[in-house]
């Protein structure tokens, strides 16, 4: 079929990453580029320029001078630019810096311990063969060896480790296969990272004892070095180590000691070569990707430096011509800058050489500029170069060359340049980069895009194609004798007449385009279709005709955003001649999330038979009826069809013969064959058919001929109460639902009772269409939808019509009067709400209430304000409900079903009861972000209200309705709410989009294999059975006990469609059933015992008394008494039979059936829960069968086997890409979540993070410090526990000073000391609340507070004052001293490491002082920053993170100093606050014993700080204290009172570590009993363990996943992840199947630790291409190159990059062709 040159005959197996060496590149290069001008004055490429023709032609007019081919055939050739001086390789600059920092510049050895080096080498060797366990074994061997031998030599250590390693390498069977697995990759990168982090920062060299040289990097372009102050030389030893004839690398000169200088690349290179001689064996393993591909492949240190730069071929950086202007490519500009620098350096070196008559070598010689002996050389350029002497100029331009070379690689490396052109990194990265734009997704042919419009006359699985598309989209059809007639006609019709053809492909692959105008040419081609072309030696297959799309061809349709699998489905084409747009059936709208307000959709036309087959069978719309998220139906009829269907099937709707026939015909237009009809329901006076009969006629004609029609008992959406006009008469045993219109009964395909509405043909579960899908398959259910749509449309068009009028929304006069009265009442409820919220007395005056409310609003702690908000909402909700009761539904002028608006709402067509209430009753309370509208600074909510007005109207309670209009202020509130919705939508798309992308990139490789395990693309098992039971979510819908009766009533059909008899004849369920019986038997036997006893334990209990009676003498050995020894001996001497008796009794419960018998090959091996469901149902069924009179033919066993078969048929198919489905099922609903469902806690509630922020916290960040950590523990239901839990709650609650402080009086005065010193004196008097005020809630006494003031608070206050004054010179010296101590560059390193650990809090702005209440400056700044960040779209968000990462990496020490200065006092304060945070309250101080003790206390406070002059306190009650503070007079003044107040709010008098607040809430548990639950804000699990008699610790729960993992292990954390994600969605009423959540959780915890789904989590992936196509491609590329990684091309991303078929779905297997 395909011409030979198109048939692929080779396949990529893998990709390895590495670096070309300088020699290889020199060989590859065809030209040295020396001319900085790339085009001459005529616009032609200049010789030796960057567009020289030797590099290949830059555009189509030229010819390559190397291979003499034109633009289309020449793939381009590399060139190079020679650099006059060596520069650092920007790719490896950071690693070079670490190498230099971790090595000794004197003896050229690494400064890490030798043991670490040999250990790492051996560990990397064993990892290369995938021996993970050996890594830990080696660590053990080393530590044991170091313990046993004192001061071992490096050689001994090496021998010891090598011995074990060689054993492992010999016994290895896998070869290098095992090395490309996630766990091994993770282990390797961990070991290497750990080595760099811990061993490369020694203070002095262990070999020559020289102090460490401090190396620092600046602007990524130069290294500066501070040499150590003294050097230890060991004479004679140094040269002995070097091999013969090797030049000794220079050590450190005497002159350089203690100096700081610039380390040039050439001296760095010398040093590196010297290290390499000493440490080469080790560096080979550390940089395995930098091997020289030579005879002996080994690490090549010259890789760290560049002597020339490679120039890519011209075609990859084309010149863009616009008119007569030329615009060059950014890459070319960057290369040009390097060349200009090179020219300048060469000139400068010539000048220096002439002046000095020296070789161009770097020595610190200042050159006297006066002796102007160089007459020949042009020196005018020197004035352009910065620097004094020539050497300075040389260094400066050398650094400039370095930064220009950097820019070629990465334009962000130079932070100082303003005009930037993209470097290599910019070309690869981000959404617009090569990986994501051109490799992961490509533009395609044979696709169409147009606006969609609705059409309910085509089938649900069809798509209407306009003629414009039909003549352009073609399919390559091979010509055969049986289709030649059709194809001839197509060729004759030509490209413009449908059905025609556009082109014919001959046997040799040449193409003949069919002319639109020349009919004779087309006829000639048509006649030769079957005759082989002349001149071809052997005919290679047949001709191929590219024919137009025709009816019935399959197309893939897609609407963006493609959030989940149903966003791409296959439809059959239906050509519509007169149209210009795509036409889509209404039923598919929900799957695509499409509406017809201008949406566009894409259509793709598959070009191979394989693709078409997949589309027809798997991707077809009929097969996509259920959504993978939770198995709910997607397709369903909408709006008009609901109203029409409900009206048509209502009792009393009759049709004459003509009408009946017309409707049946309209419903079944495309049925072939006889139509079965029903006899009329009414015969006299003339025959009439009911609407129900019309629907039944459709059903029995659609259901396939050879299947029994279905039986179904269900409910309609319209409830039974809606039909009741007046109270029914009392009848004994009256069941209101029985035979009512809300009960739908279908027997043998005939609708006998009930109205069909949204519940049956909308997108709702267990309706008529869903049941048809389940029993007869997708094709039938699709036809049911199609036919019903046509029928209902016809009914509306021909007989009924549908309209709304004002009459439908009018309210009766008496209801209106009631409504008015309630509205008047509601205006008075304001003061009542505020009083209730703030616990004010009834008698409080309005002014007092207003004052309190005003305070609550402007207080930093918003809890009171939230409380008032809640009370207001409760009040107005009460009034809203009253009004709604008065008006709806009996207050309406017309009632259901005559009321068309009610009909529309009830049947589910459109709208909700809320809409009808807004029209007829009132709009209700307007809420913004979960609160009432905020107040302006003036205290008004809108300018037309009074400040702090109480009326609900002023708080956004709208009493108007749309029927009678709303007032301007109410309209304004209404608009505010509308705007909020829009803003939310705009913001959340990007956030959830990025979240979904992260999950998809991680989980893309998870596929079900043929052994039913879920594995990642590298073969690592993530789950042994998908979702823990192996079931496919859409198939599980009818495996619920509620649906068993439906399956039983349709037994015949299901048995036939599932081939039950065949299965039973081949499968034997007995083995499995025996297993289930064994499990039941065990449970029956061990029902009472909670603890399982071992065999020896039961034996020893039995003989214990007998042994004790022996009174054995002797002493305890190894912790075992003589009695125990005797028992052990008796147990060992016991004969086999007796021992087996004990062992049998103590045998553990057999494993569950699923884990023993693989469910797909063992019939009846089902999950335990399902087995239990079947048992329960069987008993129920048997009981019912006894009661009922008519015996059912269905026996219990047959029902059981049917259910088991149904379960087995529901197993997930191998090849299912469950990872992608899980990712889509979490990502797609997250777009529907409003960004933050705001949940503002009042005083009695917990604050919780919800919505997308919480999802990001769990999935993307996996941060150890979550925003709202909490624990909850149920309290035992005993009197003692309930009494003690009250005091426990008090004990766990944190107390701040502000909560117990009544007031602070401050007096300020001046005083003059001697020597004219001026002072400012403050007298601060602190008055505390009396104990009675807080003893109920707080675990404190006044003495404790006073003790806190004396020991901690005054110190904090002085620190804060010092901080305020730090601008003035008096204290500057203190701070600078602190900073310089920490100035050493290892703090930069530890700082960076700390920062990297904290990086996972990218979005949790790090507030330094952990104790700060909700509003210190840092907190508000970070909040503001977060607000700004939230508005960025997700692409730029990703960029921001990358830049941040870069900044962190390049953090210079200067920054570190600044950070230390600002953070230090805070850190100190934080640590100080913690000191007091013991569980027990601070030591209780008894009343002072006399004057002496009192004097001591006062003295201690005075001496605690130089500023404190005097101190006094209340010796009687401990209710006040007074301190006098004397400060030197400053130019700057600050407000002491605000400082004291803010400190008092943040100073913690008493706390339990980690817990801020405690609440006791009453809940209902699973057994429907009331119980108390203790909830804490903050986490401290060990603390709660102390109260095991009060709290039921077995049911303790915490939302901090890390805390649970660290305390209870990773399996517990797994469950927490599942529960947390489920809870986030539950708030919005979204159900996601637990199988998806378990898969995501299993993946995140795969490595035994909880890892996030972000770029730090993907570092352990074994596929470098998967990492690169995710984020920070350059970073991952660098990593892969240095480590010499290999990609097996198994992950989906890697397959897409190289164009392989992804190993999933139908790509999981390959078919062998039988050749005979």
From Swiss-Prot:
Molecular function GO terms recorded: chromatin binding; DNA binding; DNA-directed RNA polymerase activity; DNA/RNA hybrid binding; magnesium ion binding; zinc ion binding
Cofactor(s) named in the record: Mg(2+)
Positions annotated to bind DNA nontemplate strand: 436
A GO CC term attached to the entry: mitochondrion
Mod. after translation: Phosphorylated.
Catalytic activity: RNA(n) + a ribonucleoside 5'-triphosphate = RNA(n+1) + diphosphate
Site (NTP recognition and base pairing): 561, 805
Residues the entry annotates as binding Zn(2+) 2: 104, 107, 205, 208
GO biological process: negative regulation of protein localization to nucleolus; rRNA transcription
Segments for region (Clamp): 110-201, 327-433
Keyword Nucleotidyltransferase recorded: yes
Cofactor-binding details, from the entry: Two Mg(2+) ions are coordinated by both the catalytic residues and the nucleic acid substrate to enhance substrate recognition and catalytic efficiency.
Keywords, sorted A to Z: Chromosome, DNA-directed RNA polymerase, Magnesium, Metal-binding, Nucleotidyltransferase, Nucleus, Phosphoprotein, Transcription, Transferase, Zinc
Region ranges (Mediates the interaction with TOP2A): 1067-1162
UniProt subcellular location: Nucleus, Nucleolus; Chromosome
Enzyme class: transferase
Biased composition (Basic and acidic residues): 1380-1397, 1452-1464
Family from the record: Belongs to the RNA polymerase beta' chain family.
Entry note about domains: The clamps form the DNA-binding cleft. The bridging helix crosses the cleft near the catalytic site and is thought to promote polymerase translocation by acting as a ratchet that moves the DNA-RNA hybrid through the active site.
Protein name, entry field: DNA-directed RNA polymerase I subunit RPA1
Source species: Rattus norvegicus (Rat)
């Amino acid at each position: 079929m395909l011409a030979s040159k198109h048939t692929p005959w080779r396949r990529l197996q893998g990709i390895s990453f590495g670096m070309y060496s300088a020699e290889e590149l020199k060989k590859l290069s065809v030209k040295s580029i020396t001319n900085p001008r790339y085009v001459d004055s005529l616009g032609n490429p200049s010789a030796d320029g960057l567009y020289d023709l030797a590099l290949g032609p830059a555009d189509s007019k030229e010819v390559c001078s190397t291979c003499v081919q034109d633009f289309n055939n020449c793939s381009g050739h590399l060139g190079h630019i020679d650099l006059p001086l060596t520069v650092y390789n920007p790719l490896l600059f950071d690693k070079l810096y670490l190498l230099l920092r971790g090595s000794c510049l004197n003896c050229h050895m690494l400064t890490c311990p030798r043991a670490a080096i040999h250990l790492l080498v051996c560990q990397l060797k064993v990892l290369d063969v995938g021996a993970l366990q050996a890594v830990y074994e080696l660590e053990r061997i080393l530590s044991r060896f170091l313990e046993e031998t004192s001061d071992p030599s490096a050689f001994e250590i090496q021998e010891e480790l090598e011995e074990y390693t060689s054993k492992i390498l010999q016994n290895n069977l896998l070869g290098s296969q095992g090395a490309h697995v996630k766990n091994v990759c993770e282990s390797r990168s961990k070991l290497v990272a750990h080595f760099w982090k811990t061993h490369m920062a020694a203070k002095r060299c262990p070999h020559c004892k020289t102090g460490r040289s401090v190396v620092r990097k600046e602007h990524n372009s130069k290294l500066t070095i501070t040499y150590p102050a003294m050097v230890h030389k060991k004479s004679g030893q140094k040269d002995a180590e070097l091999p013969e004839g090797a030049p000794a690398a220079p050590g450190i000169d005497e002159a350089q000691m203690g100096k700081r200088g610039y380390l040039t690349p050439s001296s760095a290179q010398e040093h590196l070569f010297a290290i390499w001689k000493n440490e080469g064996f080790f560096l080979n393993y550390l940089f395995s990707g930098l091997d020289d591909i030579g005879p002996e492949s080994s690490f090549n240190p010259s890789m760290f430096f560049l002597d020339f730069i490679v120039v890519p071929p011209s075609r990859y950086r084309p010149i863009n011509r616009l008119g007569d202007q030329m615009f060059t490519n950014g890459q070319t500009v960057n290369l040009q800058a390097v060349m200009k620098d090179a020219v300048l350096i060469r000139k400068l070196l010539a000048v220096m050489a002439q002046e000095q008559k020296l070789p161009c070598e770097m020595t610190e010689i200042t050159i006297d500029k006066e002796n102007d002996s160089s007459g020949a050389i042009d020196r005018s350029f020197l004035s352009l170069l910065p620097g004094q002497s020539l050497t300075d100029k040389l260094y400066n331009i050398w650094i400039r060359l370095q930064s220009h070379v950097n820019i070629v690689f990465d334009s962000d490396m130079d932070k100082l340049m303003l005009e930037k052109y993209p470097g290599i990194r910019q070309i690869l990265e981000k959404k617009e980069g090569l990986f994501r734009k051109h490799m992961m997704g490509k533009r395609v042919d044979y696709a169409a895009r147009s606006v969609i419009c609705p059409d309910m006359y085509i089938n649900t699985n069809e798509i209407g194609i306009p003629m414009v598309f039909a003549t352009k989209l073609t399919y390559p059809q091979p010509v055969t004798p049986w289709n030649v007639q059709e194809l001839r006609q197509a060729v004759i019709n030509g490209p413009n007449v449908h059905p025609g053809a556009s082109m014919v492909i001959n046997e040799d692959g040449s193409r003949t385009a069919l002319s639109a105008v020349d009919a004779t040419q087309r006829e000639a081609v048509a006649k030769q279709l079957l005759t082989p072309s002349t001149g071809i030696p052997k005919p290679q297959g047949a001709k191929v005709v590219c024919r137009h799309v025709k009816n019935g061809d399959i197309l893939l349709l897609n609407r963006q955003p493609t959030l989940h699998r149903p966003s791409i489905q296959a439809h059959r084409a239906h050509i519509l001649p007169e149209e210009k747009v795509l036409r889509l059936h209404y039923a598919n709208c929900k799957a695509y999330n499409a509406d017809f307000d201008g949406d566009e959709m894409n259509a793709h036309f598959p070009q191979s038979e394989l693709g078409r087959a997949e589309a027809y069978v798997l991707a077809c719309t009929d097969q996509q009826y259920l959504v993978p998220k939770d198995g709910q139906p997607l397709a369903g009829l909408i709006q008009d069809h609901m109203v029409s269907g409900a009206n048509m099937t209502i009792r009393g709707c009759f049709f004459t013969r003509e009408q009946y026939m017309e409707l049946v015909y309209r419903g079944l237009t495309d049925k072939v064959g006889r139509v079965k009809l029903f006899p009329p329901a009414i015969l006299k006076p003339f025959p009439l058919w009911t609407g129900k009969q019309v629907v039944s006629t459709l059903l029995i004609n659609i259901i396939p001929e050879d299947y029994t029609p279905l039986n179904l008992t269900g409910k309609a959406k319209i409830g039974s109460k809606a039909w009741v006009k007046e109270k029914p008469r009392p009848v004994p045993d009256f069941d209101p639902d029985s035979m009512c219109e809300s009960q739908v009964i279908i027997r043998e395909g005939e609708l006998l009772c009930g109205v069909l509405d949204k519940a049956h043909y909308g997108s709702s579960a267990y309706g008529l269409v869903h049941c048809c899908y389940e029993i007869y398959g997708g094709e039938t259910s699709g036809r049911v939808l199609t036919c019903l749509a046509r029928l209902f449309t016809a009914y509306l068009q021909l007989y009924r019509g549908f309209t709304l009028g004002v009459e439908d929304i009018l309210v009766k006069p008496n209801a209106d009067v009631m409504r008015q009265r309630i509205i008047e009442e509601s205006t008075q409820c304001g003061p009542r709400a505020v009083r209730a919220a703030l616990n004010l007395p009834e008698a409080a005056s309005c002014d007092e209430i207003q004052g309190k409310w005003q305070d609550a609003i402007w207080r930093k702690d918003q809890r009171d304000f939230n409380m008032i908000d809640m009370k207001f909402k409760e009040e107005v909700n009460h009034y809203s409900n009253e009004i709604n009761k008065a008006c709806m539904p009996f207050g309406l002028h017309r009632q259901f079903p005559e009321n068309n608006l009610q009909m529309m709402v009830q049947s589910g067509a459109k709208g909700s009861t809320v809409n009808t209430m807004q029209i007829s009753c009132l709009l209700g309370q307007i809420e913004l972000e979960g609160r009432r509208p905020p107040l302006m600074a003036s205290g008004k909510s809108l300018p037309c209200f009074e400040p702090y007005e109480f009326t609900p109207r002023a708080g956004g309670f709208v009493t108007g309705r749309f029927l009678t209009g709303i007032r301007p202020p109410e309209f304004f509130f209404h608009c505010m709410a509308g705007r909020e919705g829009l803003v939310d939508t705009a913001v959340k798309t990007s956030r959830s989009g990025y979240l979904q992308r992260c999950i998809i990139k991680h989980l893309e490789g998870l596929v079900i294999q043929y052994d039913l395990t879920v594995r990642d693309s590298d073969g690592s098992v993530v789950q042994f059975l998908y979702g823990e039971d192996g079931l496919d979510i859409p198939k599980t819908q009818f495996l619920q006990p509620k649906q068993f009766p439906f399956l039983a009533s349709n037994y015949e059909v299901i048995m036939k469609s599932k081939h039950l008899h065949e299965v039973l004849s081949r499968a034997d369920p007995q083995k499995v059933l025996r297993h289930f019986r064994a499990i039941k038997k065990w449970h029956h036997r061990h029902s009472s015992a909670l603890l399982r006893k071992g065999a020896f334990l039961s034996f020893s209990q039995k003989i214990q008394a007998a042994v004790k009676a022996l009174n054995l003498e002797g002493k305890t050995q190894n912790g075992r008494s003589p009695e125990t020894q005797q028992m052990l001996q008796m147990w060992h001497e016991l004969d086999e039979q007796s021992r087996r008796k004990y062992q049998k009794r103590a045998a553990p419960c057999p494993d569950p059936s699923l884990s023993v018998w693989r469910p797909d090959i063992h019939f009846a091996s089902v999950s335990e829960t399902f087995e239990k469901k079947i048992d329960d149902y069987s008993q129920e069924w048997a009981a019912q069968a006894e009661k009922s009179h008519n015996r059912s033919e269905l026996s219990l066993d047959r029902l059981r086997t049917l259910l088991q078969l149904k379960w087995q048929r529901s197993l997930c198919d191998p090849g299912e890409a469950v990872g992608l489905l899980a990712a889509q099922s979490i990502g797609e609903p997250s777009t529907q979540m409003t960004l933050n469902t705001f949940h503002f806690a009042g005083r009695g509630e917990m604050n919780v993070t919800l919505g997308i922020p919480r999802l990001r916290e769990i999935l993307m960040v996996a941060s150890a410090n979550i925003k709202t950590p909490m624990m909850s523990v149920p309290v035992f239901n005993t009197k003692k526990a309930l009494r003690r839990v009250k005091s426990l709650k008090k004990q766990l609650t944190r107390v701040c000073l502000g909560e117990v402080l009544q007031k602070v009086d401050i007096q300020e005065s001046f005083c003059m000391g001697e020597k004219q010193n001026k002072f400012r004196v403050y007298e601060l008097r602190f008055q505390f609340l009396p104990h009675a005020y807080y003893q109920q809630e707080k675990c404190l006494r006044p003495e404790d507070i006073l003790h806190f003031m004396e020991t901690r608070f005054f110190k904090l206050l002085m620190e804060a004052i010092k901080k305020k004054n730090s601008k003035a010179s008096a204290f500057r010296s203190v701070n600078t001293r602190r900073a310089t101590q920490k100035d050493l560059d290892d703090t930069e390193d530890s700082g960076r490491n700390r920062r990297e650990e904290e990086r996972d809090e990218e979005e949790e702005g790090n507030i330094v002082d952990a104790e700060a209440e909700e509003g210190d400056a840092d907190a508000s700044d970070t909040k503001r920053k977060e607000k700004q960040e939230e508005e960025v779209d997700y692409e730029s968000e990703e960029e921001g993170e990358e830049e941040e990462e870069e900044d962190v990496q390049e953090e210079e020490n200067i920054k570190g100093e600044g950070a230390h200065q600002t953070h230090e006092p805070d850190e100190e304060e934080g640590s100080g606050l913690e000191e007091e945070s013991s569980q027990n309250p601070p030591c209780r101080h008894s009343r002072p014993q006399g004057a002496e003790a009192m004097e001591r206390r006062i003295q201690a406070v005075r001496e605690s700080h130089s500023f404190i002059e005097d101190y006094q306190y209340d010796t009687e009650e401990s209710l006040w204290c007074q301190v006098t503070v004397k400060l030197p007079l400053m130019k700057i003044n600050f407000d002491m009172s605000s400082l004291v107040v803010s400190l008092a709010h943040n100073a913690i008098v008493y706390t339990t570590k980690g817990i801020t607040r405690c609440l006791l809430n009453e809940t209902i548990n699973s057994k429907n009993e009331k119980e108390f639950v203790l909830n804490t804000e903050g986490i401290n699990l060990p603390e709660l363990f102390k109260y095991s008699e009060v709290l039921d610790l077995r049911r303790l729960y915490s939302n901090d996943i890390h805390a649970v993992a660290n305390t209870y292990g990773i399996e517990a954390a797994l469950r927490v992840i599942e529960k947390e994600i489920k809870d986030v969605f539950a708030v919005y009423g979204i159900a996601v199947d637990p199988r998806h959540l378990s898969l995501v959780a299993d993946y995140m915890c795969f490595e035994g630790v909880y890892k996030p789904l972000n770029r730090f989590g993907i570092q352990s992936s074994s596929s470098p291409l998967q990492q690169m196509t995710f984020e920070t491609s350059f970073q991952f590329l660098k990593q892969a190159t240095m480590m010499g990684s290999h990609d097996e091309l198994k992950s989906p991303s890697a397959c897409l990059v190289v164009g392989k078929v992804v190993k999933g779905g139908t790509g999981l297997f390959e078919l062998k062709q039988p050749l005979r």
